[in-house]
Regions:
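Soluble extracytoplasmic domains of inner/organellar membrane proteins
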Residues: 2-6, 12-109
Length: 109
């Protein structure tokens, strides 16, 4: 059940006080709710991970672009994707997913 999973992940994130497990739980909670969660809430969870420019930043950028695209903000999603694709050392799988989303948004989909 999506709501239960999100609640459990949010609880884990809150008790871990910002450590790597908390950040991973945050990423997983957004991923779990990406299709139905409130966009502002999801973005509010991702922005701190993006701002810290840490190990989870690239995944947070990818998820942010997906949330924005789902919320009808394709132009904003494209900016986020370009930021992601400009990062050095981007993992190939992540690069491919970002390029695919960028191309689908650029084609008016």
């Amino acid at each position: 059940d999506e709501a239960g999973a999100v609640a459990a992940l949010e609880a884990l994130a809150s008790v871990r006080e910002g450590d790597a497990y908390a950040k991973a739980a945050t990423i997983f909670s957004v991923y779990t709710a990406i299709n139905s969660g409130d966009a502002a809430t999801l973005l509010g969870k991702l922005d701190p991970l993006i701002g810290e420019d840490g190990v989870f930043t690239e995944l947070a950028l990818e998820l942010k672009a997906q949330v924005l695209a789902r919320d009808g903000k394709g132009a904003e999603a494209l900016v986020v994707l370009e930021t992601l694709l400009e990062r050095e050392g981007l993992e190939r799988d992540l690069q491919t997913r970002a390029e695919t989303l960028r191309d689908s948004l650029g084609s008016g989909s």
